[in-house]
From Swiss-Prot:
This is Cobalt transport protein CbiM. The keyword Protein biosynthesis does not apply. Its main location: membrane. It comes from the Bacteria. It is found in: Cell inner membrane. Keywords: Cell inner membrane, Cell membrane, Cobalamin biosynthesis, Cobalt, Cobalt transport, Ion transport, Membrane, Signal, Transmembrane, Transmembrane helix, Transport. The lineage of its organism: Bacteria, Pseudomonadati, Thermodesulfobacteriota, Desulfuromonadia, Geobacterales. One of its GO terms (biological process) is cobalamin biosynthetic process. It is a multi-pass membrane protein.
Amino acid sequence: MKRITLYAAGSAIIGAMLLAGPAHAMHISEGILPLGWAALWFAVAAPFLALGIRRVNELSRHDLSFKPLVGLMAAVVFIISCMPIPVPTAGTCSHPCGTGIAAILVGPLVSVVITTVALLIQALFLAHGGLSTLGADVVSMGVAGSFAGWFVFRGMRRLGAGLAVAAFVAGLLADWATYLTTALELSSGVRGSEPFYPLFLKIVAAFVPTQLPLGVLEGAMTAGMVVLLHRKRPDLLAKMGVVDAGGPGAGPRRATVVMLALFCLLASLLVAGPSRASEKWPGVDETVVEKIAAEHGREPRDPLINTDQGDLLLFVFLLAGTVGGFAAGYFWRMLVAERRTYDDHT
């Protein structure tokens, strides 16, 4: 377990080098949930995390390369879930989650472990989420997102869907499930004497303009990553149980081209900057989560570690560059160097 923690934590810090400022993403900030509700979500997350750790240990006993793969996936989830993407149609920024691709590749329980490590580092060093609300964030992004993506992917594959189509829908619904669960957590925790259902619908409606297009973008991104892995390293996907050894391929090439075109189109629309360079693009955490909480008397508290002071952020960036080099090398070896060895033996 010590080794997986080092792999996952070290690799996850890579994403810090991509952030020039506070992360504009969706997490429930420190202090927003009352103590009782925060404790409840910790209790919900705990058994999934325990089962996930046991699953990692079981799989790594049979495959020594599994823990490095978990570390690499932790870096992927960390980077994706910190990457602010502007949405011109909503005037806000948000982020994909990455749990759909993680659940497809390593399973939902292991994805919960990966998500917990990523969220913990974000809460400690990037003022992204909070320690008291870590349980709620793990449940929404780690549990709901991972299991939604995994069940949808497996179900669609059994119904005969192609690899690209199944991965697309899995990534899409994993993203939306995360935000639906966040709406559930926030409306339950801050409503006071207000009826639950109207507040829940209000929060969901506030998420829709941003997360509707971003969910489609994450679906296309998930499909692209799975298809790329299948074309470069089908043996890896077979070993992880994503595809059957010697089974059908990634599906019609037309579906792959459509997914890629959709990804490029949405990406170009989403990252199109505002006409005024000085215009600010607040994150969904500000426009939805913190705004709704403030309306109900819950204000976010300052993070435990303030990276805006001193040289801590510079240290994180330098460390990220070092770890990023090792992770990039491992990813290259997995996709290219080991692929050549695989081809030589087939």
